[in-house]
Amino acid sequence: MPSRLIALVCLMTVAASAALADAKEDANKQTVLAFYEVALNKKDAEAAVRYLGAKYVQHNPSAADGAEGLKGFIQFLRDKFPQSRNEVKRALADGDFVVLHVHSVREPNTRGRAIIDIFRLENGKIVEHWDAIQDIPEKAANSNGMF
C-alpha cells in the first residue's frame, strides 16, 4: 500500500509540473503575440518596450540591442513602411522560447516575406531575438506555398 501511495504522489507531482510548464509556455506565447502586434503592426514603440526585459539582445545584424534599438527599428517602419502588416501564421512555445512563422508585407499588393522569429523570455519578458527572413518568390519550384 505505501508503494502505491508513493507512486500516486509521484504521478501527481509530474502532472502538476507539466501543467505549470504548459501554463508558462502559453503565457510566453501570449506575451510575444501581444508584443508583435504593438511593435510590428501598430508600430507603438512605447507600448512595445514594456514587453522587454532589462537587457534585450538582438541577433539580427541590422538591428541594435536594447530598448533604444527596438525603438529605432519601429521608427524606421513608421517612416519607410507605414502600411506594413505582419500576419502570424504559427506560434510555437518551448520552455522560455517562442517561435513565430510570419507573413510580412511591407507594402500593399506585394508578395512580402516569410519570417521565422525566435524569442527568448525570462520572467515573462522578452530578452533575446533571432530571425530568418526570406522573400516570397514570384515563381517557386513547387506548389506547396511558404505558409
Task: Describe each region flagged by the PLM.
Residues 1-5:
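Positively charged n-region of N-terminal signal peptides that target proteins for export
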Residues 18-147:
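C-terminal and inter-domain tail/linker signature
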Residues 6-16:
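Bacterial N-terminal signal peptides
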